[in-house]
Structures are given as structure tokens and as C-alpha cells.
Amino acid sequence: MSFELLKAEVNAGLEGRNNGIPMGFNRLNKYIGIRKSMYFLVGGLTGSGKTSFIDDAFVLNPFDWYIGQNTPKMSEITDTVPSKIKLRIIYRSMERSRTYKLAKWVSRKIFIDQGVIIPVAKLLGWNDRMSHDEHDLFLMYEDYIGAMEDVITIIDGPENAVGIAKELKAHALQNGRIEQVDEYNKRYFPNNENEITLVILDHVGLIKTTKDQPTKKEAIDKMSDELRYARDFYGYTPVAVSQFNRSISNMQRLKNGDVEPQLEDFAESSSTQNDADVVLALFDPMRYKVADSSGYDLDRLLDKNTGAKYFRSLRLIKNSYGEDDVRIGLAFMGQIGMFKEMPKRKDITDSDYQAIVDKTFFLNT
């Protein structure tokens, strides 16, 4: 039975059914990609942009690829065969409301399509109000958000690990069945073998405690255990977001210049990094006034007028199925929460630095 399952998976690979979904970062995609039964952990300090990175790499870029692959007109333009992959995303936004998430995503999409920046604060009328033309732009994206709702389910507010596990089981049973395959083993059969289901938790530090898991560590351990089960039994792809602990900024590490993220820097529990197949970390070296380990000129990635920082370092700390300890420089536009891979240090030009700060870099495809 075990070899038959392995053979079926190998055949799926030969048929191109295990290629997965691109994350929108070409260099990163050489090492990792979105496919079934993978557990991702993404960490960073507050303000590092980890939620924006999750949204870019695991939600918006995959979604845009998915609708492009499955839209006949787009397939004709790109001369591609519509993908058989079906994408489903369950997004547990425990820190931000559903309305805020959608506003951020629309703001990003308007900028990509139109080159117009409408910050979330303006979109929602917190301070300034949109002009008539800006409002007309916003209304153009109703169908885009409607298409999102067919693929992405946003659930806001904290929950405990058992509650989330029950919801994942209910979702699995709505989209498949569980059978007893022999005396000892059960197996889950999805209705659609080509469906990739991402389960995003932002962030695990907000998992609620219970009587059975009264401490934060126990709650996170339980959640990671349930995510591992969802990966192994249902074939789901969990993506957990985690805060770093404070040791990354202690005086001794700052003095030694040793502030680059390590596995030990993930807060509260070691279970998440042990259970995850892939561990990624975002780091803002400007925050600690240290040089970038890859050698980018950080002074040229800082807007001297506004103080906006346009750089983050992404490190692939753990990769169970390939190369790790990989660093990639990312240009970061915080106004709309957008990331884009920078040229390698040896290839970056003066015009690249300038384009990043004046934001035209983010519009180049």
C-alpha cells in the first residue's frame, strides 16, 4: 500500500500535477513553491512587514496567477493552457479585520494596474477623503474582489486551536471523504485531487488559550500539532505567521552585530519551527542600524524626506526539501504592503536604487 501511494505521487509529478503555484518571487521560487502538504512558517519583528509578505507571496500573487491561468482571454494572450489546479485559501486574520484586509488588497491592486497610490487610510476616509476620480477607480475593482471571494475565505478574530481544527475538519468533509483503508489506517480522499488549500494563520501568538491549554506556549504547541495533522492527513498547506522574541534586539547581540534572524528567535514555542517544512524570516537591518549581510547600500534605500525604508532582507532559514540559508533582498513599499525581488547585489544599478525609492520599480513587470 505504501509503495502504491508513493507511485501515485511520482506519476502525478510526471504528469506535471505537482508543479504547484508560483509565489511571484522568481529567485525564491527556485528553492520553494506552493504545493500540497507543505507547512510554512514566516517570522519577523513587529513592523517588519511579515503580514504584507504573507499576503503577497501566499495570497495575492498566487490568486492573480490563478485567475490569469483560468481566464480564457488571459490564456490566449499568454499562449498558456489553463491550469487544472484549483486554489482555495482559508485566511485566519486574527490581528486585522476582514474589511481592512480587503482595503489593503484593493489599494495594492489599484497601484499595480493604474500606478495610483490610494493608501488604506484614504480609501477608508480615516483622514483625507478620496476624490471623485479615485472613488471611480475603487469601484472598478468590485469584480476583482468578487472573484477573490470565490477563492479566499477571510475569518477575522482570535480562536483557539481546537476550534480552528474543528473548522478545518468540517471544511475537509465538505470537500472530500475519509475512508478506513485497512485495519490501522484511515485516508482522506479530496473531491478534487488538483485542489491546493492554503490555511493561513496571522499570527499564532494570538491563538486563544483554553482550560486544556492554559499557557500561550501550550496553545501554540497544540495549534502547530493541528496544522501538522492538516498537512499530513488532508494534504492542506498551512502558513503560520509568528513574532520574534526580544532576544534578537538584546544589547550583546547588537554589540556583536549578530542580529540576523535564527530559528531560536521565534517567540513562545519551538514547535512551529520544528514542525514546519519551510521557515522564512523577514528582517529590517535599518531598524538596528546594521549593514545588510548581502551588501546592499541601505542609505540609498531610505527616503530622506519621509523616513520610509524600502528594504527588507528575506532569509530562508529552513527548507526540509532543498537548499536553505538563502538570503534575498526585497524592495518593500509599505504604503500598499507590496514586495518585489531586487536584483542581486552584484547586478543592482544606480537606476535600480532610484527606481525603488521613487516607486517605479514596483510597476515594472
Positions of the model-derived regions?
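Helical hairpin unit composed of two closely spaced alpha helices linked by a short loop
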Residues: 179, 189-228
